[in-house]
From Swiss-Prot:
SUPFAM superfamilies the record matches: ARM repeat (SSF48371)
PANTHER family: GLOMULIN (PTHR15430:SF1)
Name of the protein in question: Aberrant root formation protein 4
Pfam (any one): Kinetochor_Ybp2
Biological role: Required for the initiation of lateral roots independent from auxin signaling. May function in maintaining the pericycle in the mitotically competent state needed for lateral root formation.
Gene for this chain: ALF4
Organism encoding this protein: Arabidopsis thaliana
Length: 626
């Protein structure tokens, strides 16, 4: 067992007298002469140091000695923790820890304990004792009682900063989940005890609590229910605080409460490992907090409610805004959970059918919803089931929506285009990596519908960004195929066709003449090259027919068939590509004749060669007419 040597600051008899005042038996002191050096067990040493702290405060000029004893006490506990950490399965050491914590609690609970001493110890003991909370259930209970004792005896505002500092330190402990439990429990009590400036105090504490909860959620063996209980306890305390306030401060505290609840929804959802339905009972308990602030599911899924909350609480404080990094994800998940279970909707007194109807009929709110769903669709930590429900919701709100509905020139989509683009980028990744064919099929349908819902002037900007940033030739091919399909739909309005046609040249050039320089890679980019050639071939034929019919709807036809653009395509795209394809085919046939990989490459290049020669023929024909 670890031994600790006593410092001979006081005589043994003096120390004994102080220990007796705390109810310590004579047998706790070994030795009988004033000059004897005493060697004690850890629990006895802790009692002695606490008694020395008490006696030094009573003596004139003893503050320096007091600080020294407190430092030694903390060092003693740290050393004890290090020894236990080295041999976590040593039951004997665990028993020693329980004895030490029990002695600390007894001394702190003594009626003779001086207030100055307990105030000074409060700056150190909550942090250092919380390390022992994960050793055993008994240790957890004792640490919680120690923290509660400080909360009861000390100034609430002091304890708020002390516990926040201890919580921040607990994030680095081996088991942040267990070690933070008594601190969070104590903090929930402190919130209620604060007498003034409640909002300012909570605004400092809540981000620290959220950081701890997020760290806990990332632990591999986290118990979601335990995590939720911790989070819910804090939420209940904040609600109790708001109920005691009036006017503006109450409104701010309620907004802060809503932000906290939305953020922990995201944290808890990410920690769920089995099925999405596991979050339903938890979200049902959170809904009353949100409805008490007047939040609605329409406001959550459009992001309007979270913007109002942030504006009220954070204002221009960018640093505080960063304390809620997952607020939009949480708001989206709250809505999706209501979609998963009618019980959640009932808890919020919401009718989701009316929300869907509103989104179907209101383009602006629908675009806002697209932007909010990107947080679910792009998350790498959520279960696929959440993403499946998000895709199904996209299909619900775009059902029956046509491109003509969103082409109202009075409605400006530019503010929402970045959010829609981010959502579609996540959708393209889902198409490639979804775990089953049904989800991939639904996601592809959602991609087509959302693209068609973007007003024509902005649709190309989104498509160009998707093609430019695509890292998959197959996905690039899919996107170019959608452009070709939109050109071929006779139901589209002229302005819609014009917007698509105007930018065909630029889209094709992105593939056939990559912006980073050099020729496209073969056979790696075969899918994208073939799709680009097919799109260009279709555009040439389409515009030729339109011109022959006298339907030059815009300058689009003359652009694609203009001598300048035809010569550019011929010299800069088609002829260099013809050389590249011919050399690639010849090289594969020559070097690896009969090899399966070689035959596969040739099989990829042959369709490209066929469409390429057809494009060259068409361009040469059009050039002759100029």
């Amino acid at each position: 067992m670890v031994k600790f040597a006593i410092i001979n600051t006081l005589t043994v008899n003096e120390t004994w007298a102080k220990l007796k005042s705390f109810g310590v038996m004579e047998s706790s002191i070994e030795g009988s002469s004033e000059s004897t050096t005493v060697t004690t067990s850890p629990s006895r040493r802790v009692r002695e140091l606490l008694a020395l702290c008490f006696s030094s405060v009573e003596e004139a000029g003893g503050f320096q000695d007091f600080e020294s004893f407190v430092t030694e006490l903390v060092s003693c506990l740290d050393s004890l923790y290090e020894n236990v950490a080295l041999d976590a399965n040593n039951e004997l050491e665990n028993d020693v820890i329980e004895e030490v914590l029990d002695e600390i609690l007894k001394v702190l609970s003594s009626p003779q304990m001086d207030q100055d001493v307990i105030d000074a110890l409060s700056f150190h003991l909550p942090k250092v004792t919380s390390k022992f909370a994960d050793i055993s259930s008994r240790c957890l209970q004792l640490v919680e009682e120690i923290v509660d004792r400080f909360v009861e005896a000390c100034n609430p505002r002091d304890m708020l900063s002390i516990l926040c500092e201890a919580l921040d330190a607990a994030r680095c402990y081996h088991s942040a989940s267990t070690c933070s439990t008594p601190l969070l429990h104590g903090l929930s009590k402190v919130f209620i005890l604060i007498q003034r400036r409640h909002y300012e105090q909570l605004k400092v504490a809540v981000p620290i609590v959220l950081n701890v909860l997020k760290d806990i959620s990332l632990e591999t063996d986290v118990q979601v229910e335990d995590l939720f209980d911790k989070a819910l306890g804090i939420a209940s305390s904040i609600r109790d605080v708001s109920s005691k306030l009036n006017n503006e401060e109450e409104a701010k505290v309620r907004c802060l409460l809503c932000l906290y609840v939305i953020q922990i929804t995201a944290i808890i959802s990410v920690s769920i490992r089995d099925k999405a339905a596991s979050c339903i009972p938890l979200v049902i308990q959170l809904e009353p907090f949100l409805t008490s602030c007047g939040l609605t599911h329409l406001g959550l899924i459009t992001g309007n409610d979270t913007e109002k909350l942030m504006s009220t609480v954070a204002g221009d404080d960018d640093e505080f805004i960063t304390s809620f990094p997952d607020i939009s994800l949480g708001a989206s998940l709250l809505f999706i959970c209501a979609k998963i279970s009618h019980e959640v909707a009932e808890a919020a007194n919401a009718v989701l059918g009316s929300v869907v109807d509103e989104l179907q009929n209101n383009p602006v709110k629908r675009w806002q919803a697209y932007g909010m769903l990107k947080y679910i669709l792009s998350s790498g930590d959520l279960l696929w089931e959440f993403k499946r429900h998000a895709i199904e919701f996209l299909l619900d709100i775009t059902k029956g929506v046509t491109s003509s509905q969103c082409n109202d020139e009075q409605i400006d989509c530019s503010d929402y285009t970045p959010g829609i683009y981010a959502t579609l980028q996540a959708v393209t990744l889902l198409i490639m990596y979804a775990p089953d064919a049904d989800l991939r099929k639904k996601t592809f349908e959602a991609l087509k519908r959302v693209l068609s819902d973007i007003p024509a002037p902005h649709r190309f900007d989104v498509l160009r960004a998707l093609v430019t940033n695509s890292r998959s030739p197959s996905m690039t091919a899919i996107l170019l195929g959608l452009v070709k399909d939109s050109m071929s739909k006779s139901s589209l309005q002229d302005t819609d066709c014009a917007a698509v046609d105007t930018h065909v040249i630029e889209l094709v050039e992105l593939v056939l003449r990559p912006p980073q320089g050099g020729p496209p890679l073969l056979p790696d980019q075969s899918d994208a090259i073939l799709a680009a050639l097919n799109l260009y071939r279709f555009a040439l034929l389409f515009e030729s027919r339109e011109c022959e019919a006298g339907k030059e709807r815009s300058k689009v036809g003359s652009d694609i068939l203009s001598k300048k653009n035809l010569e550019k395509a011929y010299k800069e795209w088609l002829l260099p590509l013809r050389t590249l394809v011919s050399c690639s085919i010849a090289e594969n046939l020559k070097e690896d004749h009969g090899q399966e990989s070689s035959l596969d490459d040739v099989g990829l290049l042959n369709p490209i060669e066929l469409v390429l020669y057809r494009c060259i023929e068409l361009v040469e024909e059009k050039l002759k007419s100029h």
